[in-house]
């Protein structure tokens, strides 16, 4: 079994120092944030997508230390009722998937997202109980009008 760590824990370090620390700690894998809530300190999506030399240097820095990428992470909300947040989250996720494909990274971790209560909502709403019935209606709206269509399109 290979053991790894989420690189976001080491945002106090630069990329090379983070990799050295992880390798010297005896770990095998790193999960790298690409944007959204984990941030993108160690992985600038646009730079890596646009430049093969930068992609090769990025991977060389990792593999030269005997490390592998277990996955990319872009935890955000692609179905947010805030259209700007939703657009940014969707773009980050799609770019992360493209980069994972280019670098043979096997996993992209993300959040499924949380919609608002209805089409007029300004903030996400997370109903956790089926009663009163308004919560069931919110739940149904979120799943059938937001989550399922978004993820079917992405897939």
Task: Please describe what each predicted stretch is.
Residues 1-3, 67, 90:
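Transmembrane beta-strand segments of Gram-negative outer membrane beta-barrel proteins
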Residues 3-7, 28-32, 69-74, 108-110:
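Hydrophobic faces of well-ordered beta-strands that scaffold small-molecule active sites
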Residues 7-13:
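Short polar catalytic/cofactor-binding loops
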Residues 10, 49-50, 88, 146:
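Residues that cap or flank secondary-structure elements
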Residues 16-38, 103-107:
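Catalytic domains of carbohydrate-active enzymes, especially glycoside hydrolases
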Residues 17, 56, 61-64, 71, ...:
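Active-site acidic/histidine proton-transfer and metal-coordination neighborhood
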Residues 33-59, 112-119:
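Glycine-rich, proline-tolerant flexible connector loops at the mouths of alpha/beta enzymes
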Residues 38-45, 73-81:
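Glycine-/proline-rich flexible loop or hinge segments
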């Amino acid at each position: 079994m290979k053991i790894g760590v989420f690189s976001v824990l080491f945002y106090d370090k630069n990329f090379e120092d983070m990799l050295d620390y992880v390798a010297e700690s005896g770990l095998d894998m790193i999960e790298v944030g690409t944007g959204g809530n984990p941030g993108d300190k160690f992985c600038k999506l646009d730079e890596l997508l646009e430049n093969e030399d930068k992609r090769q240097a990025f991977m060389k820095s990792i593999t030269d230390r005997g490390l592998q990428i277990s996955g990319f992470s872009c935890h955000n909300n692609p179905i947010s009722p805030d259209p700007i947040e939703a657009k940014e989250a969707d773009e980050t996720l799609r770019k992360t998937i493209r980069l994972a494909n280019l670098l043979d990274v096997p996993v992209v971790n993300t959040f499924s997202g949380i919609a608002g209560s209805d089409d007029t909502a300004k903030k996400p709403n997370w109903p956790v109980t089926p009663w009163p019935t308004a919560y069931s209606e919110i739940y149904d709206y979120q799943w059938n009008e937001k989550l399922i269509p978004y993820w079917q399109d992405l897939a």
